[in-house]
């Protein structure tokens, strides 16, 4: 029962006029979500719900599955050949893991902000080219990457 603290609040003498999310459809939800990389299970049978218009923080020690879970929300695990994803991830009631769902559209609609920049485990070139590439810009990638790095004032550093 998510976010139902009315009993403990009323016992503490606090207002019972609070919002509960028990009857609200989640905007983002996982059911029995399991992810493995090769033979290594990263997360197992995760049940997770995010109510509409909420902000969620995932906090935990290194290696506990936070990044793996996030990669399920934006379908980045699709790009990892050894990744096996089982279970359901729904956004606005729609299963986003099906082959008929465009991962680019999902990435436009689900935003993530990290405390520290977290480049993909690829070269600088591949990290910069990733955005244009998933948006169908395959021509002139070299020029796009160089221009982007120059505008960020790091071309001479890399």
Predicted feature descriptions by range:
Residues 27, 40-41, 104:
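Short coil-to-beta microelement around the adenine-binding A-loop and adjacent beta1/P-loop entry
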Residues 78-81, 112, 117-126:
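Conserved catalytic motifs of ABC-family nucleotide-binding domains
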Residues 88-95, 136, 140-158:
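Conserved ABC ATPase "signature" region
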Residues 74, 125-134, 142, 146:
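Short helical segment in ABC ATPase nucleotide-binding domains corresponding to the A-loop/adjacent helical element
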Residues 59-61:
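The feature captures the beta-strand-to-loop junction immediately N-terminal to the Walker
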Residues 1-34:
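ABC-family P-loop ATPase nucleotide-binding domain
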Residues 30-33, 41-54, 87-89:
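Conserved beta-strand
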Residues 82-84, 95-111, 134:
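ABC ATPase NBD coupling module
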